[in-house]
């Protein structure tokens, strides 16, 4: 018996395992047929494939080359665990969700806010919600524009039917009288924008500390001329409220000015630029008149009810309420007719 037979009988490993580089083929045995017949399969109790699994796997099962090399080199490991190492199955790959077309939803199906929205989209949505425009026409965008003045709102502004005018004053005419006469031609408020020319006589009102007026004679250049005549609250366009002021420069360089309290005689042809606009003060007054008339009618009705309850005959005829209304309106019209046709400039 030679050495190779002794190794086969003693049960030691008498075969080689030649593995290729690919590692896909089954192991190859070298030895006599008797030695190959002396090999027997040992059941592997710990094998996950049951007791029928053998030490050598099928060609479809590939072992670990590192374990096979270690087993062949050491010769101490059993042959049934040398090369039958099965790789674990790969983890189930998640099927990628197909992206839907269109804009992503803002809210999920359960009502929660979707996290797919970026921070930029959220930042752009928030200001739009805070600056959301209300319903209806925005204030101040109608036909009747309103302009804020000191402490109140004017019913109409200069942008409503504003019209410029040029007043030409000849030499020797009163500039103040020309402007006042122009303001009384219609129910429009006026304002003096600018003036150019020279005056020979100017009467200016002194401050309240020294009441009175001072008359200046000579040649003075007009630096500025300003005024605004607003329709009075009684509705008469001939009764205006306002004051005319002027600034003059003397030939020696002095500047004088103040409210005009007398004639302002032109020394050269003077041009005055005036702007006229509609101010709806009479409309407010008409509303007040309607309220007063309704109050008078209410009082007369109350008196009639009291007289009927006392079973007394009222000496006042039935047409008296209408007569009172007509008489009050007529009296006011008479007052309007006898209103001053000119503005007293001495009142300031």
UniProtKB/Swiss-Prot annotation:
Q: Where is the composition biased (Low complexity)?
A: 47-60, 112-131
Sequence motif Bipartite nuclear localization signal, residues = 98-106
Which residue spans traverse the membrane? none
Q: Which SUPFAM superfamilies match?
A: AF0104/ALDC/Ptd012-like
| SMART domains, per the entry | AT_hook
Q: Which GO terms describe its molecular function?
A: minor groove of adenine-thymine-rich DNA binding
Question: Which InterPro entries does the entry link to?
Answer: AHL (IPR039605), AT_hook_DNA-bd_motif (IPR017956), PPC_dom (IPR005175)
Presence of the UniProt keyword NAD in the record: no
The cross-references to Pfam families, in alphabetical order and at most eight, read: PCC
Polar residues: bias regions: 31-46
What residues does the PPC domain cover?
157-299
Keyword annotations of the record: DNA-binding, Nucleus, Repeat, Transcription, Transcription regulation
Start and end residues of each stretch annotated as Disordered: 18-156
List the GO cellular component terms: nucleus
Q: Where in the cell is it found?
A: Nucleus
> Main site of residence?
nucleus
What is said about the domains?
The PPC domain mediates interactions between AHL proteins.
Cross-referenced PANTHER family: AT-HOOK MOTIF NUCLEAR-LOCALIZED PROTEIN 9
Protein's name in the database: AT-hook motif nuclear-localized protein 9
**What is the organism of origin for this protein?**
Arabidopsis thaliana (Mouse-ear cress)
